[in-house]
């Protein structure tokens, strides 16, 4: 086989190196295809040598490269050289050899935290064991020297008793097997015994017993897999697509794949140094992450405190700074989630057991009261164990990773108490556009607000410019001194502010990379992974947006509304309640609406400078870096322009900010998982949903959907809870034409045929209709699923309070005359079609929707 780098494609370079003989022939192409399918690399083509030929043709005397050394790509880093050498035997082939760098790895000694995580805490549910455990903790606590702090003594006692009294939990088997291990293990033993007897003496009796044992085992395995899949997806099936987003569904895909089929763990990636070269040792990798997080958490904040002079000082909220009582502490401890503990490794189950014993609870209460009165946090509460998680993008760049802090479980008790005290204050602020980290609100609220606002203006012949802001490391850049001032301005009692200062005074971040542990000081930002983090961030964002609206005035998008059941819009001169829509916010994902490019160009630099006064940085474009903040131009209908190709000479160039910085003007933008386009059509969003659902279905096709071991009922649960949730995310707001409906129907039918293991040829030959296949799986048509989701959301918005933006926009209109031409297919007309399909009268839907139970009964009948 010949090989030449001149004819290599980019895909082929992933399997073949750049060195070889002559040109690649048909055999070489088949060889490259084999390498790609099996994820292999030909080492002998990766190193430059004087000779590559391993065989000489007997007639032409031409050299051919036939012999190779193949390796898995994940282990290619251990090879240092590969090439051709002279064979020591009488053969027409030459030998190939390689050099391997091997390094023995000593078994890593587990830490105290890891040993505590390996224990089985289920025994603490027994009252007798719980009392004995607490009694042992009390004895250990009293036996320690009194010069140590109360929390240190209690934590040490809990750790010692936990390690001494609790057993190690058995290592779980992957996924479905662990749930049915007790039932399947005896059947495996029976099968093995029958097989041994058959090998010893093969008779009709032993063969029948072996056949029966195998059949019983196969049926049990099939049932166990179906039960495990149903239990895994039941919770997801009951949840709404507005909560959790696409990430929750992809996590479920990974869980199902790992539970049904063993997956391989990836190795540590080499990181890029500042000079662009890759790290070669674990120590260099750890040093890169240390420098990255030192720069992120150790930078001194830069802000302008004078900007807070525009923030109105609220009256101090009373009756929220008193010392926590027994009921409040017990309630906060009971709400602890059984997630990753902090550096000590003490799990929430232990503290839930501690509060059930009178004397140990008294010690825990004394620790909390001492902190509340002295305002000095225990040293253990100031250490956060940082878990480094990868984001999208180049994973050799440390900037594409984020850290989540695992905090002490006892600290979370006081954090929950403070959170419950601060939440009513935050909810009393004027933050109607904000939907992030707020109860009863989600992504769909923001997407609905922006989409309906843009479609209303386009329907009335108006252009809109939308600035989508992306903040750089928003959580990790909050200036704490400014945050404390903001809390005081919003009426938070001084006692609670001092307690928060104490909890953030000396935060230590500890993380391990490639078995190298580093600890750095964190002097900026709120803690990611802390229940207080999102709440404090909302206070901070409220101050930013409130001061922005007070300092800078600009033309706003005005709408008019009446709180009734008219959805199709009114005449442009109809009277109604006026309201404006300046922006829509989901945490730090902000969409700011402008009526013209001139207003946008004038306000954008001021907005960026305003965020900079609060220590925030907006992600803008540079000559060598793309921008994550973008501008979407939403045009009026095409027939309103003389030249629709240029929108009558509209300026669609990038918005220049000076010093080479810019913001691009784009045709489409992905906002909170939903795609917004220039013409306000939903084609791009539907296509993106079909692509995402196709990837999810393909990931589970082999191990689940086409498996004969999985029942139809289990397939239905997974398909409805996972695939349809991904496919129909955001469908509550879609304005679907018949062409888009057909595309969704085609995808739905293709998935149904795959789950029934029926091809299109079978359906034609045997005249099997899609309706019959849907009945086998007990599934509905895609039209029914979309109609139910749209009407469910319509009823939810109709029941909202009148101050909510989605409720106002539902029946709103723009005071501008509609342009001449065919009427557009609006959201109101789409919902009216859904009401007709559900056989709900158009003049009575609003009154029916006020009763949630009756409304859901009608749309699900």
Tell what function each PLM region has.
Residues 1-217, 233, 795:
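A shared catalytic/ligand-binding motif for oxyanion handling
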Residues 192, 322-334, 362-371, 421-422, ...:
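Inter-domain linker/hinge segments that demarcate the starts of reverse transcriptase
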Residues 176, 300-328, 376, 381-385, ...:
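Active-site-proximal segment of RNA-dependent polymerases
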Residues 105, 190, 198, 246-398, ...:
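Surface-exposed loop/turn segments and immediately adjacent short secondary-structure elements
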Residues 20-28, 56-61, 88-90, 145-150, ...:
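Conserved, non-catalytic sequence blocks in retroelement Pol enzymes and Pol-derived host proteins
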Residues 61-64, 80, 91-94, 98-103, ...:
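Short linear motifs embedded in intrinsically disordered, charge-biased segments
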Residues 333, 337-347, 386, 396-406, ...:
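Conserved catalytic palm subdomain of right-hand nucleotidyl-transferase polymerases, strongest
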Residues 57-58, 65-66, 71-73, 92, ...:
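Basic/polar low-complexity segments
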């Amino acid at each position: 086989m010949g090989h030449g780098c001149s004819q290599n494609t980019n895909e082929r370079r992933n399997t073949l190196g750049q060195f070889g003989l002559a040109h690649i022939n048909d055999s070489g192409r088949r060889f490259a295809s084999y390498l790609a399918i099996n994820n292999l690399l030909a080492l002998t083509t990766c190193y430059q040598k004087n000779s590559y030929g391993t065989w000489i043709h007997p007639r032409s005397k031409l050299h051919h490269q036939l012999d190779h050394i193949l390796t898995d790509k994940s282990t290619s880093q251990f090879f240092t050289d590969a090439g051709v050498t002279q064979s020591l035997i009488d053969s027409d082939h030459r030998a190939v050899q390689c050099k391997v760098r091997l390094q023995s790895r000593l078994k890593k000694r587990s830490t105290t935290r890891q040993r505590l995580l390996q224990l089985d805490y289920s025994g603490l549910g027994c009252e007798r064991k719980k009392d004995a455990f607490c009694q042992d903790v009390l004895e250990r606590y009293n036996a320690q020297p009194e010069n140590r702090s109360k929390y240190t003594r209690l934590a040490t006692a809990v750790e010692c008793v936990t390690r001494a009294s609790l057993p190690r939990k058995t290592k779980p088997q992957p996924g479905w097997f662990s749930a049915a291990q007790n039932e399947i293990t005896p059947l495996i033993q029976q099968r093995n015994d029958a097989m041994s007897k058959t090998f010893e003496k093969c008779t009709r009796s032993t063969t029948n017993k072996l056949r029966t044992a195998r059949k019983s085992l196969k049926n049990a395995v099939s049932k166990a897999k179906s039960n495990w899949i149903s239990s895994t997806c039941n919770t997801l099936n009951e949840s709404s697509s507005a909560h959790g987003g696409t990430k929750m569904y992809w996590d479920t895909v990974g869980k199902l794949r790992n539970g049904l089929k063993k997956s391989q763990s990836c190795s540590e990636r080499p990181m890029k140094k500042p000079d662009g070269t890759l790290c070669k040792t674990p120590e260099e990798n750890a040093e890169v992450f240390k420098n990255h997080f030192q720069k992120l958490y150790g930078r001194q904040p830069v802000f302008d405190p004078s900007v807070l002079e525009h923030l109105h000082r609220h009256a101090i909220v009373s009756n929220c700074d008193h010392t926590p009582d027994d009921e409040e502490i017990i309630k906060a401890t009971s709400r602890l989630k059984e997630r990753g503990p902090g550096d000590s490794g003490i799990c929430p189950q232990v503290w839930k057991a501690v509060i059930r014993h009178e004397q140990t609870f008294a010690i825990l209460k004394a620790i909390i009261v001492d902190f509340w009165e002295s305002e000095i946090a225990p040293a253990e509460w100031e250490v956060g164990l940082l878990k480094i998680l990868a984001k999208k993008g180049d994973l050799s760049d440390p900037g594409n990773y984020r850290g989540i802090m695992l905090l002490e479980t006892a600290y979370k008790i006081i954090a929950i108490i403070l959170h419950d005290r601060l939440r009513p204050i935050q909810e009393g602020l004027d933050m109607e556009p904000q939907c992030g980290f707020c109860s009863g609100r989600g992504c769909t609220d923001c997407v609905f607000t922006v989409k309906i606002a843009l479609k209303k203006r386009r329907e009335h012949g108006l252009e809109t410019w939308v600035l989508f802001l992306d903040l750089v490391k928003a959580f990790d850049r909050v200036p704490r001194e400014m945050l404390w001032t903001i809390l005081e301005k919003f009426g938070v009692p001084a006692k609670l502010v001092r307690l928060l200062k104490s909890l953030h005074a000396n935060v230590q971040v500890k993380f391990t990379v490639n078995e190298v542990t580093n600890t750095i000081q964190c002097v900026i930002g709120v803690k990611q992974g802390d229940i207080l983090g999102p709440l404090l961030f909302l206070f901070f964002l409220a101050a930013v947006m409130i001061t922005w609206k007070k300092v800078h005035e600009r033309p706003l998008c005005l709408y008019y509304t009446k709180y009734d059941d008219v959805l199709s819009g009114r005449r442009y001169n109809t009277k109604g309640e006026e309201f404006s829509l300046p922006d829509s916010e989901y945490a730090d994902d902000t969409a700011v609406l402008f009526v013209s490019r001139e207003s946008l160009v004038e306000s954008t630099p001021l907005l960026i400078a305003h965020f900079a006064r609060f220590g925030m940085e907006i992600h803008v474009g540079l000559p060598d870096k793309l921008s994550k903040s973008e501008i979407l131009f939403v045009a009026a209908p095409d027939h309103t322009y003389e030249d629709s190709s240029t929108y009558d000479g509209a300026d669609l160039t990038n918005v220049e900010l000076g010093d080479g910085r810019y913001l691009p003007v784009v045709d489409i933008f992905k906002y909170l998982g939903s795609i917004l386009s220039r013409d306000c059509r939903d084609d791009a969003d539907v296509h993106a949903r079909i692509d995402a659902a196709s990837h999810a279905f393909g990931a589970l096709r082999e191990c689940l959907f086409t498996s004969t071991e999985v029942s139809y009922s289990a397939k239905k649960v997974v398909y409805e809870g996972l695939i349809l949730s991904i496919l129909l995310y955001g469908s509550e707001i879609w304005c679907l034409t018949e062409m888009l409906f057909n595309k969704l129907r085609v995808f739905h039918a293709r998935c149904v045929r795959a789950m029934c293991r029926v091809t299109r040829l079978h359906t034609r030959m045997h005249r099997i209709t899609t309706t019959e296949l849907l009945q086998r799986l007990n599934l509905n048509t895609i039209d029914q699923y979309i109609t139910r989701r749209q009407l469910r959301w319509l009823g939810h918005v109709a029941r909202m309070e009148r101050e909510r933006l989605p409720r106002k926009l539902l029946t709103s209109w723009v005071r501008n005359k509609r342009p001449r031409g065919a009427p557009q297919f609006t959201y109101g007309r789409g919902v009216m079609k859904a009401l007709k399909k559900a056989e709900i009268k158009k003049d009575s839907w609003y009154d029916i929707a006020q009763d949630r139970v009756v409304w859901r009964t009608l749309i699900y009948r």
